[in-house]
From Swiss-Prot:
Biological processes per GO annotation: DNA-templated transcription; monoatomic ion transmembrane transport; protein homooligomerization; regulation of DNA-templated transcription; symbiont entry into host cell; symbiont-mediated activation of host apoptosis; symbiont-mediated arrest of host cell cycle during G2/M transition; viral penetration into host nucleus
Reported function: During virus replication, may deplete host UNG protein, and incude G2-M cell cycle arrest. Acts by targeting specific host proteins for degradation by the 26S proteasome, through association with the cellular CUL4A-DDB1 E3 ligase complex by direct interaction with host VPRPB/DCAF-1. Cell cycle arrest reportedly occurs within hours of infection and is not blocked by antiviral agents, suggesting that it is initiated by the VPR carried into the virion. Additionally, VPR induces apoptosis in a cell cycle dependent manner suggesting that these two effects are mechanistically linked.
Localization in the cell: Virion; Host nucleus; Host extracellular space
Keywords: Activator, AIDS, Apoptosis, Cell cycle, Host G2/M cell cycle arrest by virus, Host nucleus, Host-virus interaction, Ion channel, Ion transport, Modulation of host cell cycle by virus, Phosphoprotein, Transcription, Transcription regulation, Transport, Viral penetration into host nucleus, Virion, Virus entry into host cell
Subunit comment: Homooligomer, may form homodimer. Interacts with p6-gag region of the Pr55 Gag precursor protein through a (Leu-X-X)4 motif near the C-terminus of the P6gag protein. Interacts with host UNG. May interact with host RAD23A/HHR23A. Interacts with host VPRBP/DCAF1, leading to hijack the CUL4A-RBX1-DDB1-DCAF1/VPRBP complex, mediating ubiquitination of host proteins such as TERT and ZGPAT and arrest of the cell cycle in G2 phase.
Protein name: Protein Vpr
Lineage summary: Viruses, Riboviria, Pararnavirae, Artverviricota, Revtraviricetes
Amino acid sequence: MEQAPEDQGPQREPYNEWTLDLLEELKNEAVRHFPRPWLHSLGQHIYNTYGDTWEGVEAIIRILQQLLFIHFRIGCRHSRIGITRQRRVRNGTSRS
């Protein structure tokens, strides 16, 4: 009968430590791209909804990841990631 292999990989850091590190990185990145009052309001909304829980931490991580992804995808002027905007020359025709 087969046995499960023993875990011989490197020690993983605890989930809560990893989660807090990820949240800190996301907050630092978000502050560079969004207004602080807006981020503060988001944090207040999460706190009012979830309180001081891990569920709240996971929710704000998920929201910040989505916001930053969309922000970069649309074309952040600070980043080379995203849709390249082509300059259009007006020639009188509309292709809407």
